Amino acid sequence: QIDRENVDRLQLAWVWGMEDGTSQPDPLVRDGILYVPNAGNVIQAIDGVDGTLLWEWRHTFPEGAGTRGQLRNLAVWEDLISVATEDGVMVALDARTGVVRWHSTLADWKLGYQNSSGPIVVDGKLINGIDGCSRFTEASCFITAHDARTGEELWRTYTVARPGEPGGDTWGDLPFALRGGSEVWIAGSYDSALDLLFFGTAQSKPWVAASRGLTVNDATLFANSTLALDPDDGSIVWFFQHITGE
């Protein structure tokens, strides 16, 4: 415990040089081991006492996929460390060895989908939001839940309201394929007392409302919003939009 009496005795114990590239890591610590996401989708397990590298896993990207983006978050569940890669794959690694236990495709990177946020764990489910939804496809950005043991997808919630569904009319008569943005750039959070997941979404795309054939008074749900989701089925319990039509 660091307090007023001992804070002046803190000193550098060791230093670890990370991979080159953009890096915004949030390391995990478990049983004295640091699990660190690096640029280039490299995961390292480091002894917390002396900084010794215990194991390293490097994601193999398909030809043409991005390779230098940042990963912001990892998740730990039982004996597994899980990561959502930049090219849209969920991977579970053995926490002791770094060996891949399973992998599951979240989205097709060829359509522009990517990932930077990383999963959280709730009741044995890995919950993750995707980004890279600017190219206009038949499916928008989304949040998914996967079985933490097997990788099976359990539910999927789209972050753009579809025509004919609640909030769908806030995009006017735009077909679903032209409703872009509302990406999930950072990891969500979970409130166990409320039993709710919370995720933030980005702005609509294209950025300028007139380019969408809309005005700034058109809400384009569920962009620029905080979403509260039921972790059991992914249903939107409530939402709050911070800026309308931005």
Predicted regions and their residues:
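Extracytoplasmic/lumenal domain signature
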Residues: I2-M18, I43-A65, W77, V89-K110, ...
